[in-house]
């Protein structure tokens, strides 16, 4: 461990040689779809079904490059009538350096989507507004809780898969 001052900063001469870093190299829309099968309602409060998914994969170039994808889907309905369906796959190219092996997955599935989310949220709001509806403003997402939930589900699937093989 390094010595720290009262402010929590490393003392002079004790700076880490290679601190972990996360760089955003680019952000882009991979896929965007908006379907408006009906017309915008005049006074109907629609039921909104939201879906959020996060994925990450190493980039072909290597060098600590990863593509992180944030998928947002929204389906609005009033009764049995579908008002709109919006789907967005928004991605970023990130470079991780000097991140400990055990922290890479959490960095990719928590911190990277946290950086992408405000931009994806704005795109969803604009596309619903352009579709003739009030802008859909998605509440902030707790990516730590989402990561923990995905991690638990993966562990349960692995346990159930191994349990069935015995």
Curated annotation (Swiss-Prot):
Gene Ontology terms: cellular component: cytoplasm
Biological processes per GO annotation: protein folding; protein tetramerization; protein transport
UniProt-annotated location(s): Cytoplasm
Keyword Chaperone carried by entry: yes
Keywords of this entry: Chaperone, Cytoplasm, Protein transport, Translocation, Transport
Presence of the UniProt keyword Cytoplasm in the record: yes
Biased amino acid composition, Polar residues: 1-16
Major localization class: cytoplasm
Pfam families in the cross-refs: SecB (PF02556)
SUPFAM superfamilies: SecB-like
GO MF: unfolded protein binding
Region named Disordered: 1-21
Function: One of the proteins required for the normal export of preproteins out of the cell cytoplasm. It is a molecular chaperone that binds to a subset of precursor proteins, maintaining them in a translocation-competent state. It also specifically binds to its receptor SecA.
Record note on quaternary structure: Homotetramer, a dimer of dimers. One homotetramer interacts with 1 SecA dimer.
Family per similarity comment: Belongs to the SecB family.
Protein name from the UniProt record: Protein-export protein SecB
Source organism: Hyphomonas neptunium (strain ATCC 15444)
Organism phylogeny: Bacteria, Pseudomonadati, Pseudomonadota, Alphaproteobacteria, Hyphomonadales
């Amino acid at each position: 461990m390094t010595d720290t001052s009262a402010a929590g900063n490393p003392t002079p001469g004790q700076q880490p040689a290679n601190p972990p870093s996360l760089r955003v190299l680019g952000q882009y829309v991979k896929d965007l779809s908006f379907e408006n099968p009906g017309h915008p309602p005049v006074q109907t409060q629609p039921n909104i079904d939201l879906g959020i998914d996060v994925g990450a994969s190493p980039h072909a170039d290597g060098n600590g490059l990863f593509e992180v994808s944030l998928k947002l889907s929204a389906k609005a309905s009033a009764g049995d009538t579908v008002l709109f369906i919006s789907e967005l796959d928004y991605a970023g190219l990130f470079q991780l350096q000097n991140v400990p092996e055990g922290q890479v997955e959490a960095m990719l599935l928590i911190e990277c989507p946290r950086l992408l989310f405000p931009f994806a949220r704005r795109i969803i709001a604009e596309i619903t507004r352009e579709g003739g509806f009030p802008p859909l403003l998605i509440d902030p997402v707790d990516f730590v809780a989402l990561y923990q939930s995905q991690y638990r589900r993966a562990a349960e699937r692995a346990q159930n898969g191994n349990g069935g093989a015995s």
